[in-house]
Each structure stands twice: as structure tokens, then as C-alpha cells.
Amino acid sequence: MRSGVIAQKVGMTRVFTETGEHIPVTVLKLGNCQVLGHRTTEKNGYVAMQLGSGTRKTVYLPKAERGQFAVAKVEPKRKVAEFRVSEDALIPVGAEIQADHFVVGQFVDVTGTSVGKGFAGGIKRWNFGGLRATHGVSVSHRSIGSTGGRQDPGKTFKNKKMPGHMGVDRITTLNLRVVQTDVARGLILVEGAVPGSKGGWIAVRDAVKKVLPADAPKPGKFRLADGGGEQTAAAPAAEQEGV
């Protein structure tokens, strides 16, 4: 199981195929997505990689986080996340994952925070039908109607669909196809819509319900921090004390 990446949503556009067909795509940008540390079975009880993306000023960081970035020998990151991986898919600490970590044609799962809609009624939030337009209905055309029984059960049950805050939910969209990658600019173009607003952080992983293509690099496509060039072969994971 390979690692995912942390990307930032740029927006939507479209690309044209050789036959003239246009495909709506979402542009995701990798902003110096580097490995910050490893989680091992011996130390933590599970295997994972901690990644960081974006940039952040050191003056705004707590001391504990400063030490974490110092041990990894990377610049402070704005977004930090963990990805579960198999032991043979660990990438060296400090390495920067490239956009061609994903290959054209493969499917990915993307996770983001949906756009906030504020307080919404039952029709917008839950797709309720509302009340009738005439036949005695006044003012309450868009109300949700009754929320419970009369004598039995005599109450409104918990988790009843009602008006309330809508949006700002963690949403995962499955099986989006990778249409194109741009290593020089760090861009990944996926077919379809991705949850979240422009500038929002997105986690991109290999699709769990699709077979990984045979040409997908393992453990991944990355560039070493010491300028050793792009790598695809597995490298031994160095022990990171305190990471």
C-alpha cells in the first residue's frame, strides 16, 4: 500500500483529447510535499508516513512543532497529515514526492472539507419536498412538516433530519481518474469535481476499490532532499528519534 499526497485545490478547467472530446478536470497542486517522519510497528503499533505541505513562518510555530521539523531537516509546513502505508512503501524522511507519483489513467480517492453553506432549511439540506402550494397551506410552503408522532411515540427522535448548519464536512470522493500530471509545476489533473473550495487542502490516495496500475512507481516517485535526483526504488527508512 503506497502513500498518498497532500495537495491544494487550484480550481476547475477542461482538457481536450486527441478526438476533440473535452474532459472537465480539477487541478491539484503539490506544494513541496515532503516526508516528515515514519510511524513504525515497534514504536507506534502501526506503519504510516507523516507528510507536510505548504510553507509556514517559524515564528508562529509552537516549540514542539519546531523541534519536529528540525529533526526532519525540512522547512516548517502549513499542513501536516499521516498516511497508512505498508512497510515496503516507506519513503526516506526529507524526500519530496513528485506529481508523477500517480500515473495517467489510474484512479484515486480524494478527501477534502466541503464548502460551508451556513444555516440551511430542510429542502436545501435534505432534499425535502416541502408542503403543497395551495389547498390551505399558507406561509409554510418550505417547512419540513411534522417531526414526530402524537401520543405514540410522543417525541421527536434524535438524529431527525431538520434544518441546521450545512457544509464544512469531511468528504471523500472515490474513483476519480488521473487525466494528466505536470512534474515541473507540481500539478495533478483529475477528472470531475473535488470537495472543498479553492485553496483548500486535499488528500489524494490510490483508489481502494480499483487495481493499482502495473506501471505505478513503488514505493513512489520522489526526489531526495540532498539533491540526489528523482527516485522510485525503495530506500531503507532511517530511524528518526522523536519524530
UniProtKB/Swiss-Prot annotation:
Keywords: Methylation, Ribonucleoprotein, Ribosomal protein, RNA-binding, rRNA-binding. This is Large ribosomal subunit protein uL3. GO terms for molecular function: rRNA binding; structural constituent of ribosome. One of its GO terms (cellular component) is cytosolic large ribosomal subunit. The lineage of its organism: Bacteria, Pseudomonadati, Pseudomonadota, Alphaproteobacteria, Hyphomicrobiales. PROSITE patterns: RIBOSOMAL_L3 (PS00474). The gene is rplC. Methylated by PrmB. Residues 231-243 have a biased composition (Low complexity). One of the primary rRNA binding proteins, it binds directly near the 3'-end of the 23S rRNA, where it nucleates assembly of the 50S subunit. Belongs to the universal ribosomal protein uL3 family. It comes from Rhodopseudomonas palustris (strain BisB18). Transmembrane segments: none annotated.
